[in-house]
Amino acid sequence: MIRASFRASFLGSLLFVLVACGSSSSIATPPTTPTEPAQQPEFGEGPPLVTPGERMTYRVELAGFELAQMTLAVGDVTDLGGTKTVIVQGHAKSVGLADRIAAIDDTFTSWIDVESGRSLRFAVDEFETNSKTNIEHTIADLAARSGDQLPITFALNDATPAPEPQKLAYPDAWDYNAFLVALRAWEAPVGTAKSLEVLRSRWLWHIDVTIGGKDKLTTELGELPALRFDATTHKLTRAGERDPGSDERRFSVWISDDDGRVPLQITARTDYGDVKMRIVDYQPGTGQRLRP
């Protein structure tokens, strides 16, 4: 039987690539000897690799038991404070027995600069842990960053938003959607690593991500060539220090190794068993791809 506390330790962390509850991970094949490519852009450098109208749908499973559906959708190009941005929105919805035990209906919205690929604003609306009525609202104003301080506000239901400034360690801060979009475009030799700070919901997480190697992945869309990224992560406090209650987690992401660079699967090993988020449908969009 799935306990009600399951939401706090797994489902509530679903959108951050299934890592907030993991212990060890990684379905891995040994990396091959890298071939040095021509000059490659840095992580996240340049326009985001998305197409307006693009939509990806995933099934989330724990040991073969379906828990939730997740979608990642790309909206239109829109103006935000005088800057052209593209809206990218993630949505997680619990299904079946999991929905009756711990309802999830959470939305994560990013406004990503169409030139730099950096997120300028990140808004989250999600159920409070173990509640089916109270909704938490978090807004991170990444465009208003000042020095090492990132303005974040938090409110429960209709309460007045309270400031929760976040201290940062790196020149760039990412949110979950922008991180996944940047991962799509990242090309470098196998073994190349990057340290990042990424917002997942209300909190900031430190991630060390490495290009792991090439695989063949069997999906509902067929057998596809894939590039694997392996990572570790831990939660940070508002002061930018490692949260003493946060263990190091491991996860892997597979992205199609073709022109589409579509996120195909995310896996983690959790205290409850193996968790997989697998693609079940892909719509390429009808607009102009923002990254040539």
Q: Which sequence ranges carry the predicted segments?
A:
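Active-site/ligand-binding surface loops and adjacent short beta/alpha elements
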Residues: 146-200
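Short linear sequence motifs
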Residues: 9, 51, 58, 115, ...
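Acidic, serine/threonine-rich low-complexity disordered tracts
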Residues: 21-146, 185-292
